[in-house]
């Protein structure tokens, strides 16, 4: 094998396998924070106390796992609850409790990342082994930084209680009842919209099928018309050929008759006795 080809083959063999690109479902549509908040299993408001490296596992698998140890792609976080869990949540822990949130890091379609000593709003869920994981509803963000805008949004959507000193969120909840009504409507409205979109999609598929059949019928009609035109053309051509043939036959018969008249025998002269 030539040296350049050998080097190229060695380079390809030594290079890591390409990572799988992010592939969302074909029917995926983005959801608002409010709708995702309603669908999230639990919402907590907590401060990150410490970060701990985490080995690759079921919830943080990546094709390039051999880099995880070097780059620190996966980690867990020790967090402290700044308020009781959000109203309606299934996690019954009071403010000041410390929890371990696993499954953080960088993934193919999204990232769950936090910084130590900062506070966040978390969408979390619990697995069958009672591990707390980020709940990335609809393959979207599950962690929100502690900003005034997010405080206003989440304190309006959910009722936090018994917050730590200086972390009261109820100051933004004057429109909570209105937001709660909107929150309860969110899933039903989204479901109705999705059903309507699915119905429209099915109708579009039916229309596309009918249009395809219509095009096929048009092609068949065109072929029949072309065949009919060709048949008429052939018929006219045969008529002309037949007419010319009849004319030739008529002319030939007339010529034969004239020739026959010209060849009548001469009568012998009459002799008197």
From Swiss-Prot:
Q: Spell out the GO cellular component terms annotated for this protein, sorted alphabetically and separated by semicolons.
A: endoplasmic reticulum; extracellular region
From the UniProt record, list the coiled-coil ranges: 188-250
Identify the stretch annotated as signal peptide in this record.
1-21
The Gene Ontology biological process terms listed for this entry are: lipid biosynthetic process; negative regulation of gene expression; negative regulation of lipid biosynthetic process; negative regulation of tumor necrosis factor-mediated signaling pathway; positive regulation of fat cell differentiation; positive regulation of lipid biosynthetic process; signal transduction
Q: How is it modified after translation?
A: N-glycosylated.
Keyword Cytoplasm listed? The answer is no
- Chief location category: secreted
| Domain of life the protein comes from | Eukaryota
Q: What happens when the gene is disrupted?
A: Mice exhibit a lean phenotype with reduced fat mass and smaller adipocyte size compared to wild type mice. Adipose tissue exhibit decreased levels of lipogenic genes, such as fatty-acid synthase (FASN), acetyl-CoA carboxylase (ACACA) and diacylglycerol O-acyltransferase-2 (DGAT2). Mice exhibit strongly inhibited age-related hepatic steatosis and decreased number of inflammatory cells in epididymal adipose tissue.
Q: Does the keyword Transcription regulation apply?
A: no
The protein's assembly and partners: Homodimer.
Function per UniProt: Negatively regulates TNF-alpha-induced pro-inflammatory response in endothelial cells (ECs) via inhibition of TNF-alpha-induced NF-kappaB activation in ECs. Positively regulates lipid accumulation in adipose cells.
Annotated protein name in UniProt: Coiled-coil domain-containing protein 3
Native source organism of the sequence? Mus musculus
The gene designation is Ccdc3
